């Protein structure tokens, strides 16, 4: 049995364990909001309006568990998500049509907006990924789609396939009033009572939110029109992203982990024990395992990673 859903030598590990994921995660939520029907599902059937921070942390927990959680842990989380989604429906005010939250097209959009954002942000931030590794990341993430009720063939499994999908769905995307409000929430989120310990860090969030907005595709920023466009913005955003990544990478793991909820931290601690038992050197933390020269994989680990 694999110690983690994704092996440390996987492309998934290289992307998801990078600290640029904070920007990638917020970018993903901003991109997802441009699908008018999907946005109505979030607006009507979630607590996003009162707890956008919680939504981000739940997404981080899902990414964590489906990366370094045990296969059994990820299966349990996926089953829970599918049960919740199966019970939820909403009405599109533009058409009056009722929709289920777990409709295939909506699930595909959410998946693609997430993993495309994760990959594109990682590459832009300077994560060293070859074109083959980028394709492998999307192929690996097609397996993750099963946790929300999709099959691997429902979603793009290469960069070329992802580009074709995003081009095909682009005409249906637009910034509704709800989407613009969602982006403003993400730029300056409220801190709910159960996360009050993070309140002192709120002023530090705006640069992260603004950078997440800045690394959206240009067409998406034009749709929103929430922040002004400036000359040289693309190059400046890339430079700022790389600077932020370097700063976050310098934060010791014990302090960095304070921003995650208890369940996510507990999952990481359990993963550390399983990896140690499997022969991985984890004394320098999970991030050290991303470098192929800094971990010792047990016999057969590469075969398991391909399975």
Give residue spans per PLM region.
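Mature, function-bearing regions of proteins
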Residues: 1-307
């Amino acid at each position: 049995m694999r110690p983690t859903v994704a092996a440390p030598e996987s492309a998934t590990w290289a992307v998801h364990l990078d600290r640029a994921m904070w920007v990638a995660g917020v970018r993903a939520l901003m991109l997802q909001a441009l699908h008018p029907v999907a946005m109505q599902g979030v607006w009507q059937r979630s607590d996003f309006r009162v707890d956008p921070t919680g939504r981000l942390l739940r997404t981080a927990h899902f990414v964590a568990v489906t990366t370094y959680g045990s296969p059994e842990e990820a299966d349990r989380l996926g089953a829970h998500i599918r049960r919740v989604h199966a019970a939820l429906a909403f009405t599109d005010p533009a058409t009056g049509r009722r929709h289920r939250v777990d409709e295939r097209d909506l699930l595909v959009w959410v998946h693609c907006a997430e993993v495309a954002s994760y990959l594109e942000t990682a590459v832009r931030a300077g994560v060293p990924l070859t074109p083959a590794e980028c394709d492998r990341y999307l192929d690996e993430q097609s397996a993750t789609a099963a946790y929300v009720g999709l099959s691997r063939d429902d979603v793009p499994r290469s960069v070329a396939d992802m580009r074709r999908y995003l081009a095909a769905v682009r005409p249906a995307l637009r910034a509704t009033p709800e989407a613009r409000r969602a982006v403003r929430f993400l730029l300056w989120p409220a801190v709910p009572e159960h996360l009050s310990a993070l309140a002192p860090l709120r002023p530090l969030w705006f640069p992260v939110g603004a950078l997440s907005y800045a690394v959206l595709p240009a067409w998406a920023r034009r749709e929103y029109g929430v922040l002004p466009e400036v000359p040289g913005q693309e190059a400046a955003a890339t430079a700022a992203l790389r600077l932020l990544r370097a700063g976050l990478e310098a934060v010791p793991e014990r302090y960095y982990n304070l921003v995650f909820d208890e369940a996510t931290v507990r999952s990481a601690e359990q993963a550390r024990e399983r990896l140690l038992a499997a022969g991985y050197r984890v004394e320098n933390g999970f991030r050290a395992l991303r470098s192929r020269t800094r971990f010792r994989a047990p016999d057969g680990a590469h075969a398991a990673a391909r399975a």
